[in-house]
């Protein structure tokens, strides 16, 4: 305890006030660090190496599938969750829940914010399956954390996410929430006012899927409605919402394409081509001329690439498109928002064999789509270029006027090689040294889009690839560019760096929205996570 009166008296006698100011500063930093659970002293004091810390560091070292030294964890369970949640779709439910339990135990509030960031379809990663798996676990094991956030689940995702909480300890609260919203929508509809999207996502009692029918009947019963009354109510709500499925079922193609949601426009594009080609082509032509807008908010770049690249890349087949497909693909791709800035950044894409081993979407399609997107939208000197991993990395210049042309062009460079990250670093460093280029000539950032299963480092197999690269650049008088490790298939939860590494960010997922998030300032993994989930959008999410 500080005796302020005694200290003030000593100051009046000419005692130096600097120690007191330092104590006040120390207390301020400690209190803030405690509130936000942020490790803050690494920038004030030099970290002391103890036997315990060194044992932790050594026991954390592990190997990638290709024999490279890497880290088993970042040193923060929350950061492990944050850095991988966008790539968890290939994991089993048990593995997903295991990762979340660790993070939730470390910091419940932070884990919940990461969870909702992972689901957020508008400003986050848009991961549906992972979110539903975790909230189902929470519903049985931490029901209070679900009840506090029930009203936000549909806001960040969809109303049918709530159905994952049936048969959990939160079922009563979920049913009550759905019933209140259902009644509000019925009243609003009868008054000619706008309604929510609940009617679109509630299960039908006359669907073709037996499980959907079973759940629909269950909802109707707890809503105190007969199956017939429930069915008619949903039909009326869906007519009010004007969901396009009603039109397609009735073969009614009088709807306005400009007013359709992005997911529906993409999902039913073949039906439009086959049954309403003249009007649909006219709409696409107007999009190309800037006279109409094609919404792409809930579409991801890999969805345009997956049907064409997954097979052709594996079997060296040529990509072919019909003219109608070309029109649709070109208009959709050109309508994606631009999330890139004018920084000199270069993407590096992993198309090794392991990137084709998972179910759809294949990680290779995700990586290629993001690489192509970023190369096109890059405004720096590396515009329209990306690198593919290999023993001899390929720097590919993208050519072609339209998306279809460019997609067909990059498919000719398929090698399905290995993930030699050391060779990528050497390509950049050797070019800089031989050409006597300045630091300013190098890329400011490298975005490494991969499953993180890198090859072992030939130069020093006892070090991580990142540490080896950093040393190699320093020895030649250069600084390693900032690195964005972008995970698209987290099979083994390896971490290329730990939480406080400077000049690095750890991200994951399929959305190009992340490009805008990693565009600013100095990076470190933990700091980047804190900045992301401290966004006011997630302030209301608590455990």
What are the language-model segments listed below?
Residues 12, 24-25:
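Low-complexity intrinsically disordered segments
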Residues 4-7, 26, 34, 42, ...:
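Low-complexity, intrinsically disordered or signal/transmembrane-proximal segments
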Residues 9-10, 17-20, 34-36:
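Short, often N-terminal, low-complexity regions
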Residues 39-366, 376-543:
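Long lumenal/extracellular ectodomains of secretory and single-pass membrane proteins
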